[in-house]
Amino acid sequence: MSEDESNSVSCSLSLESDGYSDEEYDTNLNKLIENESLNWIFVGGKGGVGKTTTSCSIAVQLSKRRESVLLLSTDPAHNTSDAFNQKFTNQPTLINSFDNLYCMEIDTNYSENTAFKLNKKEMFDNILPELLHSFPGIDEALCFAELMQSIKNMKYSVIVFDTAPTGHTLRLLAFPDLLKKALGYLINIREKLKGTLNVLKNFTNNEMEFDSLYEKINHLNAMSSSIQANFQNPMKTTFVCVCIPEFLSVYETERLIQELTKKNISCYNIVVNQVVFPLDSPNVNLENCKNLLSQIKNEQIQSYFNDLISKTEELEDVYISRRKLQSKYLTQIKNLYSNDFHIVCMPQLKNEIRGLNNISSFSEMLLQSKDIPIYKDNL
């Protein structure tokens, strides 16, 4: 990650813009969970970094404080069902053991069943798809528009989005700009061809169809503006970045934060998963053990303990190497973001996070402050 890239992160996404003072950069998610003004919380990052675990855990904590919570998966992989060991569909389903936490998994692939679906039997209706498809990605933007409009009308206190990997998520967040551009293009065409359209309306005796068409255009334009306003309101919407201390993940997190900055979308929390923390080492010196072994005459005992010491040294080397490697990227994360973000380091666990008990335990750890564990050789 270059210095120019690092310096390009805008202060507009910092804690200061969300009402936090310089002394409140806690290394936990308490302020996120306690912020009752938020309606939409997006959780995103590179694939395989623990987005679903993090979003599920955030939703569990929110369910303790909010009247109703919806966990909504837009990731085609739909790992939320696996996380809770419960099948979810495209309809809100109450999660087992909760009375106010729901989950749904939706397919964001383009469907013809959008608000812009037209009757292809009518002459003028055939023109619109050609115009729309001249904008790459407009079909996906239309689907996102319908999705976000339906979500906007849902009566939940807060919605947590378990998003797809970064590229797909950025397209979701960018759809208002693309849609407004395409619709603006159509509106301009209408103004330029107003006289011709009036002739066509008289010729086809189809005035209601023309008016209905542009009513749809104006409706979608207003809807896009409304959703974009929600995206850019830090009191209503925020983004939680999830990463692991590895090069590709840290680089993609930086790219994501820069894109969020450009779109004026609030982001003041970073969760770093799979972090190897220092161990509480026993007071044992391996060299002393070797010296003691040399005094033991029984060769069988010597062989057994020599093998044990050798394996212990190998494990220690792997552990230290891993700590040093992670510390390189944890140092970058700390230098880049510690002045503007809550950075929450979550430990590498021996078991996968599946089932309500494990998710609940993980969610509690998100609220516990932990120093960023930089290996001493990297200080």
Curated annotation (Swiss-Prot):
- What's the top EC group for this one? hydrolase
EC number(s)? 3.6.-.-
**Active-site residues, record numbering mapped to chain:** 75
**Localization (cell):** Cytoplasm; Endoplasmic reticulum
UniProt record, GO biological process = monoatomic ion transport; tail-anchored membrane protein insertion into ER membrane
Compositional bias of kind Low complexity:
7-18
GO CC annotation, single: GET complex
- Record-stated family: Belongs to the arsA ATPase family.
Q: What does this chain do?
A: ATPase required for the post-translational delivery of tail-anchored (TA) proteins to the endoplasmic reticulum. Recognizes and selectively binds the transmembrane domain of TA proteins in the cytosol. This complex then targets to the endoplasmic reticulum by membrane-bound receptors, where the tail-anchored protein is released for insertion. This process is regulated by ATP binding and hydrolysis. ATP binding drives the homodimer towards the closed dimer state, facilitating recognition of newly synthesized TA membrane proteins. ATP hydrolysis is required for insertion.
* Matching PANTHER family: ARSENICAL PUMP-DRIVING ATPASE ARSENITE-TRANSLOCATING ATPASE, ATPASE GET3
Q: What is this protein called?
A: ATPase ASNA1 homolog
Give the organism's phylogenetic lineage: Eukaryota, Sar, Alveolata, Apicomplexa, Aconoidasida
